Amino acid sequence: MAIIEAENLTVSYYGDIDILKDVSFEAEEGRITTIIGPNGAGKSTLLKTLYGLLIPKTGTIRFRGKSITGLKVHRFIHTGIAYVPQLRSIFPDLTVRENLELGTWIFKKDRKRVDRAIDEVCERFPILGEKRKTRAGLLSGGQQKILEIGRSLLTRPSVCLLDEPTATLAPRIAEQIYRTMVDLKSEKITVVMVDQRVRQAFDVSDHLYILELGRNKASGTRHEFEGSLKEMIKGWLT
């Protein structure tokens, strides 16, 4: 059953050239769905639209069957949808702990709930507990990405939207991120990601969507794409 879905989305920046053209998408609950395609295909634009950062010119977005098209961004955290952008979103002059606390504003002043949520994230990512008093700007790139993902999980979302979560990371750290996605799936959390490490993302995904030039090119399960993915990627590079 689809937990988040979009139908016939057309999206542009500043009302000019359409970046997404009649794109449809759905992600099943408790599954990993990956959006792949060549540069400029509209992958990140789709994630931003699903999270309400961009308003579609046409089309509908639904979460658990209810329309969330045009919902204000600050309300998305209350719906159970989290988003980690491609560009770094940490506050470098704040400590790891302070960065995490910023992700708990929904709990208001319930200190016990805040502490419990942060402890759970630090248990999932021990490095965050070890570095909790360290300024975030002093962390490695991989540790900063772990901090961003950890912060997104503080509210126990139903859906995590991850834009290029392994970009520029060392293979060892990227593998840790992929393992985290599999762990989230085991906890019935839906993961929707954009990723350029196609082979590795393919291996952990249940379903894939391929975008080209802002349009749906193909979609299917990992097994349905076995054998054809290599040729498809080769076509993007020529």
Regions inferred by a protein language model and the residue ranges of each:
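The feature captures the beta-strand-to-loop junction immediately N-terminal to the Walker
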Residues: I36-P38
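Conserved ABC ATPase signature
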Residues: R135-L139
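ABC-type ATPase nucleotide-binding domains, specifically the catalytic core motifs of the NBD
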Residues: Y14-G15, V96-R113, R124-P126, G220
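Conserved ABC transporter NBD signature motif
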Residues: G59-I68, T79, R113-I118, G220
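ABC ATPase C-loop
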Residues: S152-L153
